[in-house]
């Protein structure tokens, strides 16, 4: 009974899910601050896309808290490493002389941002898997019912 009241009061989110969402907000803020600190337009676009993807992942998790368990690697490894790499990029970018090692490291980080963005996009897409199954199932049932009632034209059948 008390657990039900607690869940109702917190929007149906368990303390674990709330903690994930709060930590997620901190990561998003950190990503944004790095983006503000890094002037390069091309790398800034990559970071902006990352912020958008990560924000959507957490929005989807808030709407569907059962997805929180799928974020463990993202929370424990991918996001901390992302923040670390962005911090390193900021430091490298601030150097007055951009020598070969600095340029190579920055390029490597930029390429890794592309990889991370692809991974975050795939993770976001995976969070919609159950929704996609539900939609397909609902459409299939609807088409069957319409066909049984003789309400479906041949052009609408798959």
Residue ranges and their predicted role:
Residues 45-158:
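Soluble C-terminal extramembrane regulatory/interaction domains of multi-pass membrane proteins
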Residues 1-62:
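Membrane-proximal, non-transmembrane interface segments of integral membrane proteins
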């Amino acid at each position: 009974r008390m657990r039900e009241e607690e869940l109702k009061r917190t929007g149906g989110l368990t303390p674990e899910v709330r903690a994930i969402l709060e930590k997620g907000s901190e990561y998003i803020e950190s990503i944004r601050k790095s983006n503000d600190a890094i002037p390069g337009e091309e790398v800034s676009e990559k970071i902006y896309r990352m912020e958008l993807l990560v924000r959507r992942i957490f929005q989807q998790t808030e709407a569907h808290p059962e997805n929180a368990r799928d974020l463990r690697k993202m929370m424990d490894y991918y996001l901390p490493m992302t923040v670390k790499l962005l911090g390193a990029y900021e430091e490298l970018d601030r150097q007055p002389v951009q020598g070969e090692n600095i340029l190579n490291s920055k390029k490597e980080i930029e390429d890794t941002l592309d990889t991370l963005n692809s991974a975050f996009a795939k993770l976001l897409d995976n969070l919609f898997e159950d929704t996609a199954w539900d939609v397909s199932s609902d459409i299939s049932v609807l088409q069957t019912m319409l066909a049984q009632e003789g309400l479906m034209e041949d052009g609408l059948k798959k």
